[in-house]
């Protein structure tokens, strides 16, 4: 019964993630880790290398502990139950030791994570068996671990044995993630320790307006700039409910702008807009900043939002649709036509040439910006760049129309700049998990 319930819950989670264009290639189950005795294998490894030892004195007597390089607070550890109960705070020496196995033999949170981290790098000496969980999942077949060799299926990709491991866990788990790096180093795996990345992020809260719209009493957080989502307080937001609310609002806006669209098309476009609203909002802030989610801000067609970027891409697409109708020019024929177009507009020393080249050069920065985001683990630089690029295009098109430009050669060069911009913005949106609808 427990396995059935877990399976159904996971499938609903996957369906929700699929609404936001998020897919996975492997599901790992904690039960398989336990049944395959990953921890027992890792514990033997830790004992043999001396990375952990049994404390024989003080409040931690009988516990297997690991020496740690720096102190952490209970709040940082995120798991105060890891330490044995005590009436008094431990002394300085004990604060430099982290409990891995309690005196009653139970394994702490960080102990289990050590075994899992070793598996991720292919250092554990043990592996799961694998079976297909969903053959037609988003992006290809979705695999699942299994502890039963009889359930294993052939053809699984090579999971584990990673060169780099990036654990996406909120900032309150920073201390425990540091301990994982220290454990790898203590075992002699210095390279793997340096290649263990904690991609931390701050919490996501709600604006007061959004919390009220979702039906929550915000009086207890009246003196704070946001409403903290808390399971303990019973204040939570279901992702599907939020997406539904965003999609309903987006559908109303799309219908207002495109009264002739069938309901099915409106619904499909609204889902695309809702997804972009959430995904862009989640990456436009730096990782160290609390994200205060506001429905109206996320859905704005005119502010720094996913829908604004989508609209800027749709606008460029519409230009090419009308170019085809009026002048018989599409993106493929444009390249050939440019070969005979006079380059005067490109070579002129005037504001128009400066602005055209400015749009092209700004579009060309995408690869460098993405590289910066990877190096710094700060995806907000991509979001900020995409927003700036969309603004640059809107400013350019306002000053220099393409469709109504009477000079054919100038029209071609402007169209070429728009084509390059469109390709780069569409790629930037795709990197953030956002697609471009046909209308908005």
Where are these regions (language model features)?
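Non-catalytic interaction-recognition regions
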Residues: 1-440
